[in-house]
Amino acid sequence: MSTGTFVVSQPLNYRGGARVEPVDASGTEKAFEPATGRVIATFACSGEKEVNLAVENAKAAFKLWSKKSGLERCQVLLEAARIIKERKDEIATVETINNGKSIFEARLDVDTCWQCLEYYAGLAASMAGEHIQLPGGSFGYTRREPLGVCVGIGAWNYPFQIACWKSAPALACGNAMIFKPSPFTPVSALLLAEIYTKAGAPPGLFNVVQGGAATGQFLCHHREVAKISFTGSVPTGVKIMEMSAKGVKPITLELGGKSPLIIFSDCNMENAVKGALMANFLTQGQVCCNGTRVFVQKEIADKFINEVVKQTQKIKLGDPLLEDTRMGPLINAPHLERVLGFVKLAKEQGATVLCGGEVYVPEDPKLKHGYYMTPCILTNCRDDMTCVKEEIFGPVMSILTFGTEAEVLERANDTTFGLAAGVFTRDIQRAHRVAAELQAGTCYINNYNVSPVELPFGGYKKSGFGRENGRVTIEYYSQLKTVCVEMGDVESAF
């Protein structure tokens, strides 16, 4: 498959173990190929009747799935992981076409997906409660039970990965899931749905409904939905909290960020530069946990800036399906204009553009309508600038300098976000001291933007709550029942 050739020819909803057209609609959406600007799909947004059918299907599957042993669920998840691994190139290609990230990155994303399913397959087979001895031979025990029908609402920057990260722990715990992808990237979640069915999941266990805000509202308000997990923007997260509160539904929110990356003067310079690039330019900078506020100690600022600019200018832009491309297009035209607007405003507020920040037109004529821009480095930034305070969600790195550890910690924590943070230093005591003081859910020491499925991921402050990945996520997709057993006579107060 090559750029400019892919067209969706099948329905994009998945219900009852098959692709289906929605029975009713709340509007239509178009999905684009960011590299070319070409429409690859026009689809109906699921209406209330379609959402109701998806929930009914999921409820029926839940009754079967929740009665299976942990080992039986483990076997299905392991088979799904095997199929994902087997179809890695196909999935990565579809992801690249619909999202715009390089095929190199997309393959790495798919690796984290089968790893996630394998990890939770192992936990499915080992979930257990506790036995508590009580006086007189009586005892109590706990049961970890599934919630029911869970809803996952995904973002467009990691469409397939987010679908896996939300569904794997949900299914491991015995739940069913209805997944709503972003309307910008509706395609790859269908591949996961088909894989689960092929792996032996009951029809309806993982359903996909397409749509925008209205479809999301139908899901959040549905009385049979037990839990919602959302990845996306803070304003949308707030609305989901409000809707979920009316039904007293537990939620997981993974929202935005404006994360600090602190570079101390004693760092390994080569690694720090690599870390800064990883913290800013993966997926064209469209990553919620990116370390876009790069604080560099004054003693090494000039050297660091020179090197990071040199390496940034080497990044290969172009057709995301080519093996040597390392940066593809942004997700769509409005988002490209938004990111370019941040760069323009930064210059107006006094920042200096050392490289990039401009529209890029690849030589290949089929890419001339793609949504490309050159990766941007900003210096002479201040903490009060818009580019330092607001999430840009594009390939824009803002560099600030600092003097002391105490100073940089105060400035790094001066944000309403708290998704991630990073520190580069050779001083191991300082590294752990700084990580302890940073107000963020995930802190990196001498690395950035690595996502082992064994480690929990999630935010502080307005970056959300709850966690993806790691053993703890089991607690967010299950509920604890206490059983108290009396082995003697009842001692009554009456």
From Swiss-Prot:
Keywords for this protein: Acetylation, Cytoplasm, NAD, Oxidoreductase
Main location: cytoplasm
EC number: 1.2.1.47, 1.2.1.3, 1.2.1.46, 1.2.1.19
Record-listed NAD(+) binding positions: 180, 232-236, 391
Location in or out of the cell: Cytoplasm, Cytosol; Cytoplasm
Reaction equations catalysed: 4-(trimethylamino)butanal + NAD(+) + H2O = 4-(trimethylamino)butanoate + NADH + 2 H(+); an aldehyde + NAD(+) + H2O = a carboxylate + NADH + 2 H(+); 4-aminobutanal + NAD(+) + H2O = 4-aminobutanoate + NADH + 2 H(+); formaldehyde + NAD(+) + H2O = formate + NADH + 2 H(+)
Pfam families hit by this protein: Aldedh
Modified residues (N-acetylserine): 2
Active-site residues from the entry: 254, 288
GO MF term list: 4-trimethylammoniobutyraldehyde dehydrogenase activity; acetaldehyde dehydrogenase (NAD+) activity; aldehyde dehydrogenase (NAD+) activity; aminobutyraldehyde dehydrogenase (NAD+) activity; formaldehyde dehydrogenase (NAD+) activity; oxidoreductase activity, acting on the aldehyde or oxo group of donors, NAD or NADP as acceptor
Positions carrying N6-acetyllysine: 30, 298, 303, 344
GO cellular component: cytosol; mitochondrion
Pathway it works in: Amine and polyamine biosynthesis; carnitine biosynthesis
GO biological process annotation, one example: carnitine metabolic process
Disulfide bonds: none
Enzyme class: oxidoreductase
List of residues that carry N6-succinyllysine: 30, 59, 303
Subunit organization: Homotetramer.
Protein family membership: Belongs to the aldehyde dehydrogenase family.
Function of the molecule: Converts gamma-trimethylaminobutyraldehyde into gamma-butyrobetaine with high efficiency (in vitro). Can catalyze the irreversible oxidation of a broad range of aldehydes to the corresponding acids in an NAD-dependent reaction, but with low efficiency. Catalyzes the oxidation of aldehydes arising from biogenic amines and polyamines.
Listed name of the protein: 4-trimethylaminobutyraldehyde dehydrogenase
Gene giving rise to this polypeptide: Aldh9a1
